[in-house]
Amino acid sequence: MIILVRHGEATHHTQRLTGGWTDSQLTEKGRAQIKAAAVKLAKDFAGRNCKLRILASDLQRASASAQIIAEELGFKGEIEHCRFLREKNNGIAAGMTEEEAKKHFCKPASEQELDHRNYPGGETRNEFYRRNVHGLWHCADVDKENLLIVAHKGTIQNIIFRWLGMDMQQVAAFNFSVDVQPASVTVLRINKWHEHAVFRLNDVSHLTQGKGFGVFEFKYEK
């Protein structure tokens, strides 16, 4: 089983900085979001003596989120901080404001260019995918171990794509994506038919009590 948790709201969200390798910290709201996810996860693990590994991106917003979850679960092991779980490398744009980064942005000819670098020193989509996937599949038996992974939107998307058997060429060909909101929880498991199944996807029910599904909150193409 793989439980994927995106970090909570971070300072780069509120200060209008670029994401990527900007090493932003959780906001108070972000900490509360992750705490809510952790409390709900603790209910799943209560009374269960199952072996669990917790892996987290080494960027502060993810590692701090992982620590909050580990404490709520009463996790006794060591959190594994993994550089390969970082968000897509945005090169020289890391740490810049969104306005500053626009001056360095290299627009691709199409959204499906997989070997294009948006910023000098940054990664291509193919490089990003390979880093995430090769790193995780080499350090863990993803079909058999219980893994709780705290990472970033793009990283979680890449893990989901690989779980579904898709490489980046297929993702681009189908123009496919999944939404991954801050502090959301996604659960991947092998089902009773031995299929790679998605049991939860972008679940934010711990943040939306009393609200609707949020169907009008998504960004639609007009």
Enumerate the predicted regions with their spans:
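Glycine-rich phosphate-binding loop signature in dinucleotide/nucleotide-binding domains
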Residues: 44-50, 139-146
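Generic structural signal for well-ordered alpha-helical scaffold segments
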Residues: 35-43, 129, 133-141
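Short, active-site-adjacent cap segments at secondary-structure transitions
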Residues: 11, 61-63, 87-88, 155-157
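Generic beta-sheet signal
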Residues: 2, 52, 145-151
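Short, well-ordered beta-to-alpha junction loops that form the rim of enzyme active sites
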Residues: 8, 56-59, 84, 149-154, ...
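Short glycine/proline- and acidic residue-enriched helix-loop micro-motifs
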Residues: 106-127
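Active-site-proximal alpha-helix that buttresses catalytic centers in soluble enzyme cores
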Residues: 2, 6-77, 123
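Acidic, low-complexity terminal tails and accessory targeting/binding regions
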Residues: 1, 47, 71, 75, ...
